[in-house]
Amino acid sequence: MSFSVDVLANIAIELQRGIGHQDRFQRLITTLRQVLECDASALLRYDSRQFIPLAIDGLAKDVLGRRFALEGHPRLEAIARAGDVVRFPADSELPDPYDGLIPGQESLKVHACVGLPLFAGQNLIGALTLDGMQPDQFDVFSDEELRLIAALAAGALSNALLIEQLESQNMLPGDATPFEAVKQTQMIGLSPGMTQLKKEIEIVAASDLNVLISGETGTGKELVAKAIHEASPRAVNPLVYLNCAALPESVAESELFGHVKGAFTGAISNRSGKFEMADNGTLFLDEIGELSLALQAKLLRVLQYGDIQRVGDDRCLRVDVRVLAATNRDLREEVLAGRFRADLFHRLSVFPLSVPPLRERGDDVILLAGYFCEQCRLRQGLSRVVLSAGARNLLQHYSFPGNVRELEHAIHRAVVLARATRSGDEVILEAQHFAFPEVTLPTPEVAAVPVVKQNLREATEAFQRETIRQALAQNHHNWAACARMLETDVANLHRLAKRLGLKD
């Protein structure tokens, strides 16, 4: 088999049809999977010796949340080191990173694997991976044909990365190349709430405004603060952290503003406070709502005039500090109750950000679960950690009052429990490994029997059409996987789909 001009043109067209980068990447992966008839495909971005999935097809959804460190994935390391197409033999001793992550094939090992490194000039920027369940699945495609595919994908990814850098309005170091940007915090999530939050972070990071980050406990407010700092012009200077809830009243002023020798009993030397440490950088005040009214007044002065006074010192020191504050309280209610100063609230909340709770983030819970599974795999030296269908269903229907922090602890605990019930270095997390309070899973509703308005043939075709649509959706539009699920020959399925108007 060889690629026709029409096939390559179709791939190029799909790369232009998407509205955003994510849509274009997904179209590319879906089209490649159809053209190459593979069971799974993925587009990965290379960053700091790890591959980050950008788009997948035929793989479990939690793959999008995983971060594949080269040290833990020898096949991906081989792809990163190669300058050309990499074909792994079916009997390769190198474990495949997607073993157990192809829906419906969890118990089988991937047999055919091709890796295409993607370059912008001499810089590795990503990779395309193609996987199949048959050993000789990709033998019909020449290296030259696969290089054409890699060139198209590399061009799309290179343009996307360049546009991303321009849109971020961040200046690179003077000697940096376009693909050597300062590493920034990765915030995992594709839900509308997280997409909006990422846009707002990008907007406010380029400014010097104070930011008030609100959200429930465990939602990741500190991660938001870190992302703002790392995407700001202050990124080369320190981000200093202070938990106001853990600050004893007796030393709170000293912690914030510092003290001079002899200022109080135990002050045996001069000491800089958090504001001095954060000069020209960023100060993150976590749980700002826990500060006393007296300290709030002193903090307000710093925000107004930009100077601090060490405890026991009459002199004022000028500081240039951006303040990011976080709280799990409703500070408006605290102001009305007289527990928080209104003037300080308005100074801090120049640009308010709200971090959505995990229960409102939809499928993000699965992406995050994949991220934590990969972390556990690396830390505990396991060959793979995967979620069963039952575990995924449970995670999607639990409310997570402790949010992302609770999910992280639940995954780590489940891995420990799962390891105790089976030998070997492969772990499959089942629903029973999660010690959640009772979760009511939805039961399929029995549809009312419709009034017959079709003849038998029309009703049969309508049933076949809907069954095929559902099977395609469950298998990410992979016709081969769909045929296996429906227990029919793939060629017969294609013919039936054409007759039913599901294919051109």
UniProtKB/Swiss-Prot annotation:
Modified residues (4-aspartylphosphate): D57
Keywords associated with the record: ATP-binding, DNA-binding, Nucleotide-binding, Phosphoprotein, Transcription, Transcription regulation
Induction note: By anaerobic conditions, however not induced by NO alone.
SUPFAM superfamilies xrefs: GAF domain-like (SSF55781), Homeodomain-like (SSF46689), P-loop containing nucleoside triphosphate hydrolases (SSF52540)
Region (NO sensor or transducer) residue spans: 1-186
Record's function text: Required for the expression of anaerobic nitric oxide (NO) reductase, acts as a transcriptional activator for at least the norVW operon. Activation also requires sigma-54. Not required for induction of the aerobic NO-detoxifying enzyme NO dioxygenase. Binds to the promoter region of norVW, to a consensus target sequence, GT-(N7)-AC, which is highly conserved among proteobacteria.
Protein name: Anaerobic nitric oxide reductase transcription regulator NorR
